Amino acid sequence: MADKAKPAKAANRTPPKSPGDPSKDRAAKRLSLESEGAGEGAAASPELSALEEAFRRFAVHGDARATGREMHGKNWSKLCKDCQVIDGRNVTVTDVDIVFSKIKGKSCRTITFEQFQEALEELAKKRFKDKSSEEAVREVHRLIEGKAPIISGVTKAISSPTVSRLTDTTKFTGSHKERFDPSGKGKGKAGRVDLVDESGYVSGYKHAGTYDQKVQGGK
């Protein structure tokens, strides 16, 4: 008798996973990684100190392309002047320029925030000679912390005889004078057009309309 056929193994009834869209999977994974990285970066990035905020304000002053991470010599001098690091006695403009040239790299034209702090340490020794090194640095930092560039150079009006002649209505003569009232306000059309005076009085007569008052006063 022939051997009975062995029963076939039961098929795996677990349905196979349907293949997903690879592009969607990659996008989801990328978003997950970016969100995790953003969270870690936000937690790792400390808040700027008041000194570094002042550094960045002066670093970008007058330069729309500046990032605030490096400072030019001109802005360094302005910071020292506006924040009164330069007192004209212990620290002068020359001292500030010398320190900047000493701290920056030979082929560089700017200084970083770390170099900025080194430069302040150099100036602190001169600015506060009667204090210890640490106290002097703290005093210099207090002069700068929270400060911003002082905006100056506002154009002022310059009075000159020529300008005054052209703008002061009280000095106008002839037909130009008739276009403005005593307050300097323009009369409009009345100041440009010769209107016929039909009052019966001679032009320029100053007592027009006073006859009736005189007659009534004499009675």
UniProtKB/Swiss-Prot annotation:
Gene3D superfamilies: EF-hand. SUPFAM superfamilies: EF-hand. It comes from the Eukaryota. GO terms for cellular component: cytoplasm; cytosol; microtubule; microtubule organizing center; mitochondrion; mitotic spindle; nucleus; perinuclear region of cytoplasm. This is Tubulin polymerization-promoting protein. The modification Phosphothreonine is found at T14, T92. Residues 1-46, 171-192 are annotated as: Disordered. Belongs to the TPPP family. Residues 22-33, 175-184 have a biased composition (Basic and acidic residues). Keywords: Cell cycle, Cell division, Cytoplasm, Cytoskeleton, Glycoprotein, Golgi apparatus, Hydrolase, Magnesium, Metal-binding, Mitosis, Nucleus, Phosphoprotein, Zinc. Changing S160E: In 4Glu; phosphomimetic mutant, does not affect G1/S-phase transition. Zn(2+) binds at H61, H72, C80, C83. Its main location: Golgi. It is found in: Golgi outpost; Cytoplasm, Cytoskeleton, Microtubule organizing center; Cytoplasm, Cytoskeleton; Nucleus. It is an enzyme of class 3 (hydrolase). Phosphorylated by LIMK1 on serine residues; phosphorylation may alter the tubulin polymerization activity. Phosphorylation by LIMK2, but not LIMK1, regulates astral microtubule organization at early stage of mitosis. Phosphorylation by ROCK1 at Ser-32, Ser-107 and Ser-159 inhibits interaction with HDAC6, resulting in decreased acetylation of tubulin, increased cell motility and entry into S-phase. Phosphorylation by CDK1 inhibits the microtubule polymerizing activity. Degraded by the proteasome; zinc-binding inhibits degradation by the proteasome. Widely expressed. One of its GO terms (molecular function) is tubulin binding. Transmembrane segments: none annotated.
